[in-house]
A protein has these predicted regions:
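Adenine nucleotide phosphate-binding catalytic loops in nucleotide-utilizing enzymes
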Residues: 3-12, 189-314
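Phosphate-binding loop of NTP-binding sites
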Residues: 3-192, 199, 205
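Generic secondary-structure signature for well-ordered alpha-helical cores
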Residues: 27-34, 88, 160, 164-168, ...
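Short N-terminal or domain-adjacent regulatory/targeting segments
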Residues: 38-53, 287-289, 314, 320, ...
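Cofactor-binding loop segments of dinucleotide-utilizing enzymes, especially the Rossmann-like FAD-
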Residues: 68-69, 94, 195, 283, ...
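Buried hydrophobic packing segments
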Residues: 79, 83, 102-106, 264-274, ...
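Active-site flanking residues adjacent to catalytic metal/cofactor-binding acidic residues
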Residues: 117, 173-175, 262, 307, ...
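Active-site beta-alpha connecting loops in nucleotide-dependent enzymes
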Residues: 291, 303, 309-352
Length: 352
């Protein structure tokens, strides 16, 4: 145990120290019995012993929270890379984005001054109350796992309410997404990013007035209120990323697709808002490759196979755009298990 870790542990209340010891024991038992790394069970046990443990472990950290329907894991890894130019960063390695996974991550990264935390959309309000993030990154909002999440407009309203409780928090929001814009519109500190919004089927009406959303190229506005697309501070094109004060730099990524250029732009904007040097942040996001199995390339016989993941219509639209039209073949596998949602009716909305 490092001196810094020991000093940090000594400052914690007895209940929290007991919770950490129990979590460590659970991880050890899980690994010894071949049942996995034990991070999740450790997080669950720690939270049961000390319900305030997330808040206690996050205290003193400069934290970026990343959320959205699609791109959370990728953007979190990019944000981690960009913040890494400032110092040590703790983040989930496996995309476990609910309370137990977040607690497990914070447990293992006690001494890191920075945290980049992926958070499920439903959990953002109470997680933000616990970790008090310096930056909240809002990527996109669309239908996802209807048997668990429900109506997306409910998520938008909950996010809006959660943001209102943190007036000092910087919100890095995608102004091309109508629902994200609505969630962030009233925030006091917003950095608007034109990160792309190819899927518009879930935002044909204004979330604030119910009137139609009118679109003209990249611009959009509500016919019933003065609610419209804000002017972005950050944006990207086929070659470069552009930011405030005339900043421009080449944007070279290891990941395919326009959506990932948008993810990278939001990650850079978040890191810069927390003090990163822009050029260094851009170079850092370009180092990100495979993300929890996504985008990885596997050799199968004589073929190189790239793995893509999508779990809703918006995600599939982006994934399909990444497929090489000259590829020798395409295999689509559908998982209808609990972690990814048992309601598969959304597949009918994908233009295969």
């Amino acid at each position: 145990m490092s001196d810094a870790h020991a000093r940090s542990r000594a400052r914690l209340p007895l209940r929290t120290r007991t919770a950490l010891a129990a979590a460590a024991g659970a991880r050890w038992a899980s690994q010894r019995t071949g049942r996995g790394k034990g991070s999740m069970i450790g997080g669950l046990i720690a939270a049961r012993i000390d319900p305030s443990i997330m808040q206690r472990l996050a205290a003193g950290k400069r934290t970026a929270v990343v959320t959205g329907t699609n791109g959370k894991s990728t953007t979190t890894k990019m944000t981690t890379a960009a913040l890494g130019t400032l110092g040590e960063v703790i983040s989930q390695a496996d995309g476990a984005n609910m309370d137990a996974g977040i607690i497990a991550t914070l447990t293992l990264g006690r001494t890191a001054p920075y945290a980049a935390i992926e958070v499920d959309e439903l959990h953002v309000p109470h997680v933000s109350d616990a970790v008090d993030p310096e930056v909240l990154v809002l990527l996109n909002l669309s239908r996802d796992q209807l048997d668990r999440v429900g109506e997306i407009t409910i998520i938008e309203k909950r996010l809006r309410e959660g943001i209102a409780r943190h007036p000092d928090m910087i919100v890095v929001a995608n102004c091309d997404d109508v629902l994200v814009t609505s969630a962030a519109y009233d925030a006091q500190n917003v950095v608007w990013v034109a990160a792309g919004g190819g899927w518009a089927n879930d935002s044909i009406s204004c979330p604030r007035s119910g009137e139609p959303i009118i679109r003209d190229g990249d611009d959009w506005w509500s016919s019933g209120t003065d609610f419209r697309r804000p002017t972005p501070t950050w944006w990207f094109d086929d070659d470069s990323i552009h930011g405030p004060d005339g900043f421009t730099a080449p944007l070279r990524l290891n990941l395919p697709g326009k959506a990932n250029r948008g993810n990278a732009t939001q990650a850079v904007a978040a890191a810069v808002a927390m003090g990163a040097e822009p050029t260094a942040a851009v170079e850092a996001v370009g180092t990100v490759g495979e993300v929890a199995g996504r985008y990885g390339v596997r050799q199968v016989g004589d073929h190189s196979v790239r793995m893509l993941l999508a779990k809703n219509p918006a995600g599939w639209q982006e994934a399909l755009s990444m497929i090489d039209p000259d590829a020798a073949g395409l295999v689509i596998a559908v998982n209808g298990q609990v972690p990814d949602g048992e309601d598969l009716s959304w597949l009918w909305d994908v233009r295969f």
